[in-house]
C-alpha cells in the first residue's frame, strides 16, 4: 500500500501542471542562480545565444546597474556583462545588426556584434517601459505599463501609438497586427488600431508572449504561471511555480526546437522548458 501511495504521489506531482492540458512544458535545464534579476530572454538563432536583460535592482529605478548578459543554449553562463551601464532593461528585439532594449524611459540601440551602446531614444513622459517588439517593416513598439500606452519608434522618431489600456506589458507583432498583453487579457490591434480581445481571465501579471503556431501562443505571467492560448480565446495552464516563489517573466522561444526560455526574476536564473 505504501509503494502504491508513493507511486500515486509521484504521478500527481509529475502531472500537476498538465491536468486536462494538451500542451505541456518539461524542464530541460536551469542556470545557476547568479543572474542578477533576469527579466527578459531574447533567443538569437543566428549565433545560438540567449541574451538576458538583467535589472540587478528595482524595476523602475535609474541606477546604472542594469546589464545584458549572454547564456549558452546548454544553460551555462557566458558573460553577465556583455552590455553594462543600463538601468532596468526589459524587453528586447533585433533589427538588422542592432539590438533594441526597453530601459525605463529610453529605447536603447546596441550594436549586436560589439555590444556597444549606439544611441538612446527618450520616450517623452514615459515612466515604466516594459516590453518591446519589432514588426516586418522595422517599426519598433514599446509598452509603458505605468502610463497605459504603447509607443512607436519609426524613422528615429518616437510617438504614442495606442493608449487607454489598463497595464500593458507583453507585445508581439504578427503580420499587420500588434498583440498586447494587458492585465490578464490578450488584445489584438489590427492595422487600423481596432482592438479585439482574443483571450481574458489570465493572471493579472501577464508578461511575455511568443507565437508557437499561427494563432497559438505561449503567455507568461510574472507571478509564476504560463498559459497556452489560442486565437479562439481558449487557454490552458501549463505551468505554475508560484508555490516555489519562482517568477515567470518575459520569455524567449526557439521555434525550431520548441524550447521556451523562462527568466525567473527573483530566483536569479533562467530555466529552459521543452514545449510538447
Stretch-by-stretch model annotation:
Residues 35-47, 64-65, 83-98, 124-140, ...:
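Beta-rich, blade/repeat-based domains predominating
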Residues 1-26:
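Bacterial Sec-dependent N-terminal signal peptides
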Residues 250-276:
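Blade-level signature of beta-propeller repeat domains, shared across WD40, Kelch, NHL, RCC1
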Residues 71-75, 111-116, 153-157, 190-194, ...:
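Short loop/turn segments that connect beta-strands within beta-propeller blades
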Residues 25, 106-107, 112-137, 142-143:
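Asp-box/WD-like beta-propeller blade repeats and closely related beta-sheet repeat scaffolds
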Residues 56-60, 106, 147-148, 185-187, ...:
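Short glycine/acidic-enriched loop and turn motifs that connect beta-strands
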Residues 53, 102, 143, 181, ...:
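Residue-level marker for isolated small/hydroxyl-bearing positions within beta-strands
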Residues 26-32, 76-83, 116-122, 157-163, ...:
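A short beta-strand motif characteristic of beta-propeller blades
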